[in-house]
Structure formats: structure tokens, C-alpha cells
Amino acid sequence: MRDPAPSDTQKKRVIVGMSGGVDSSVSALLLMEQGYQVEGLFMKNWEEDDGTEYCTAMDDLADAQAVCDKIGIKLHTANFAAEYWDNVFEHFLAEYKAGRTPNPDILCNREIKFKAFLDYAMMLGADLIATGHYVRRRDIDGRTELLKGLDPNKDQSYFLHAVGGEQIAKTLFPVGELEKPEVRAIAEKHDLATAKKKDSTGICFIGERRFSDFLKQYLPAQPGEIKTTEGEVIGRHHGLMYHTIGQRQGLGIGGLKDAGEEPWYVLIKDLEHNELIVGQGNDHPWLFSRALLASDIYWVNPIDLSLPRRLTAKVRYRQSDQPCTLEKTTNGYRATFDDPQRAVTPGQSVVFYDGEICLGGGVIEVAEPWSSKDARP
């Protein structure tokens, strides 16, 4: 279902989250063309390193202002750095300290973009907010569903799975019905300053710097041994927090005698002994899981799923939908997959779908081996 037609938009005031990127720029433009009263809001979510080569906030604000000036709308600014630190960044650090690999973008959406920003926009008198996310919404039977974006290469429902239906109901997603090339074409046609601006990648507060350089500013590293699955010590790591399951690059253990030429991969992060367990080969059996246990489940809508139930799931962004059976456990949920899943990583999110509907998801706690003979210590 497309967002309301012009006849439904009379006098509705929408505040668009302007990131300084092309997607939010085109979102604001499209809403104006649909007859909404549109204003923009630029969020500042990070205070550290302002003015350095890593922080693009000033450039992004300038781009957002240029677009707003071009299309003739007001741009508000708001500082949510304190909320971001308390609700996103401290959790990010705690997860890494615990040896897990978190996804701060998911928390940022739930706590900042669809909570702090939404509340602030309502305080400014908005009827609705809008963002440049590649997702869609559908109102049905008194609830609002979150749907995948039409562009399978840009669909961002994975990152919005923890946002509630009540928040989705107050949000418009103008580019969710479009593919990325169409969005850029619209921006170029209207000569928007962001038309050719590259998409942002990675974690926003880290920017282009090395991840390890950033993390060691906040957490003390604990070096330890790198071992094979047979227990042989073949190197040392600088800290388990710098590594993730399935990682190949940056291990520094090449050229070992009688080891063969296959690359090494991270298989296990042994927190108890502060050891990194590695093995050779992209298809090493310890990399594959049959099932996972998840906690901290957020459903977009609190509906009865009549578990166990056949669904599809993603254990990482841009993964194709993986058929699975979801069931309730004592402490959370268990998803059992039809096919082996590679590098299922504790701390990351598993997101569940029923066709094009994003139902919700949770945090991966445990990855179970594909077969008993592949059981890990």
C-alpha cells in the first residue's frame, strides 16, 4: 500500500529526518509533491571527535540545509547525543566487553529515530514523521505492519524490526516503494545537492577510522592465545573484542608449517580462557549452525504467532530469507533452520518474516552446531 494520496494529506504536517543523504532528501521532496506540509530535522547523535577527519556531521548538516533551501522547507536541528550515549553506545560497549558483536543501528532506530526524534517532532506539532528507510507500512485490522522495501538490495526492515507498530503507524516511508536508481534519478532531476553523494556505510560514530583504534579508546584490550581446534597455539590476539565469528582478515597467522594454503577463520571466541579458536577453510564445519537461541525479542505487533510456526529469518543484513521453524523456549525463542547457517554470531540480530511482513526479531544468544559430530567445546 502506498502512502496516502494527496487528497488525504491536506494540512498534515510531516517532519522528515534529514540525514544529509539522498534518501531522506528525496523523501522530503516526494512528500511535498504529495501535498503534505513538510519540514526537516537534522539529528546530532554523537559529540566526540567533532571537527576531526572522522566526523561528517558538519558536512551532513550543510547538505541537509542545502536540500531544504532548494525545495523551500524549514530545517530544525536537535541534539540527541545524551540519549544516544545512554541508550545505544553504553549497550554497544557492554556487549563488546562481554565478547559479543552488537548491532548499534538497530538500537539507534528503536531508541533515537523512532523514539527521541518521534517525540521531539510531536512536540513541534507534527502529525507524522518520515524517514528515508527502504521499508513500507500497511494498515490492516487495526494494526500497522512493517513490510520489506520493494528494492531487495536496499530493504532495511532488518534494522527496523525492533520498532513497534505504534511508531510505524506515525511514520511515512516515501522511498520504500522505489528502487535506489529511481531515487537517485529523482534527486538528479531536481538538482538536489545530495544526488551523487555516496551512501554511508559502517557504524556512524566510527566513520572511516579503524575499528580497533576506536574501540581501544573505551575498552582495555586483553591479549591472549590463538589456538587451532586441536589446541595448538599458533599465534596471539590483541583482544577478543576485535574479532567476530567467521572473520578471515587480520588474524596474522599465515605461513604456518604443514598448515596448507587454506585461509584461517575465527570459529569460537572462548571468553572463559580468553582464547580465539580458529580453523582452516571457508566451509569449516564449526562455522555452520542448525539452530539458534534468541532473547530480547521485539515484535512489531504483539500478536499470537501460534508457535511453533514456519517462517523465514535473516541472521544478517542482506541475507536471503532462510526457511526455519520458530518455537518458544523457557528463556526465549529457538529457530531451527532447514539449511546450514554460516557464522551465526551471538550479539547480532535474527529477524523473522512471514512473506513480505517483518514480524520482529531478537538478539542471538547461542548458535547450535549443524550436527552432533560438529559439536564445539
Curated annotation (Swiss-Prot):
Active site (catalytic residues): 108, 204
Single annotated GO MF: tRNA-uridine 2-sulfurtransferase activity
Keyword RNA-binding attributed: yes
Coiled-coil positions: none
Pfam families from the UniProt entry: tRNA_Me_trans, tRNA_Me_trans_C, tRNA_Me_trans_M
Ranges for region Interaction with target base in tRNA: 103-105
Residues marked Interaction with tRNA (site): 133, 348
EC supergroup of this enzyme: transferase
InterPro entries associated with the record: MnmA-like (IPR004506), MnmA-like_C (IPR046885), MnmA-like_central (IPR046884), MnmA-like_central_sf (IPR023382), Rossmann-like_a/b/a_fold (IPR014729)
Name by which UniProt lists this protein: tRNA-specific 2-thiouridylase MnmA
